[in-house]
Amino acid sequence: MKLSVLWVSVFAFLASASLAQEVTQHSALKGPIDDNALTWAPSKWGKEDRAGSANHTLNSANIAKALATIKKNKALTIGKHYHSEAPGFGPRKWNMWIPGTPTGGPFGKNALVYHDELVTTQIGQIQTQFDGPGHIGVNTTKGPMFYNGVISWDAYERGAGNQVIGMGPLGVEHVGELGFVCRLVVLDAVAYRKSQGKLSAAAEMLPIPKQPGDIGIVTADDVQAMVKAQGLKEIGSGDCVALHTGQGNTWGATRYKSMNSEQRAAARAIFAEGEPGFGISACRYLASRDIALTMGDTSANDAQPGNEEMGYAVPCHSEMQTRRGIWNFENVDTETLIKAGVQEGAFIWAPLKIIGATGSPGNPMVLY
């Protein structure tokens, strides 16, 4: 691709992003309002806290508990591939170019040449992604409210032309300063539904739920039953919990690079229909256990469009993140863990310290 075409593409991407309406007054956005959220602050971690559940990493007992799960001295990575044909929510898209062939050189007596890459994307909210403090909020009469009572109008960092260039106190770098070292509990919902006789032996994934009661919704009772059935110790303070629904297998890291464009398009179609995942009762239960992180193999980890309480938009997101500062990792490759027989391990990862970003890409490691 010629550089002139490259930069036209970049500018077009940036221009499309600027089309979103920006509201600057200190008031609610048009649409639904929930002022119950105004009672959620201050956080249990203190009124000035910006890291939420990453504070569990400061507890040496949590690190010791995580490391105690390592029995075989083996490691796995559970991030998926970043690529233009991989699924993305809504308009989110990964675009990457190599500017120049090569980008620079040759230089010096050794005739050195090099390549760079240029990426345009929603860097914190694409493919395997971590949701940080600035990602999910609730519309209130005071304006959009995020973790620990921060109103977005008051948070924004602005640059030239008053353009918002960062989330200020809600930036993901605050979580990145601490990161996560936690005992990982892997819940295999596919095996569990099969054991109940609710899913065929040949099925690889839970169905997309459409209404309350569908088996694609994992409830609080289901979580507790899976822990017991898998012979695991109870989920406790500072633990991280991964849910395997099987839907992520459609573009798992072990198969994505061998898929052709038609297969990748089919995976994107499944991804766009909805997803099995946690019901709101499961998230409330996990919050009561004081966990550090939820994760799973789908785009949100919330069951949708069907959930236990209908009419809410990905309710675990606001219940866990906005209300409690318990963060969420999406599109994790749980298939790799299931194939290796990993039900428990040490999860180690930290988001990139992108100042003001809403989230972070990443490739976490699990030691077991």
Segments the model singles out, each with a brief description of its role:
Residues 1-20:
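Fungal secretory targeting signals
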Residues 21-368:
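Active-/binding-site microenvironments in catalytic and ligand-binding cores
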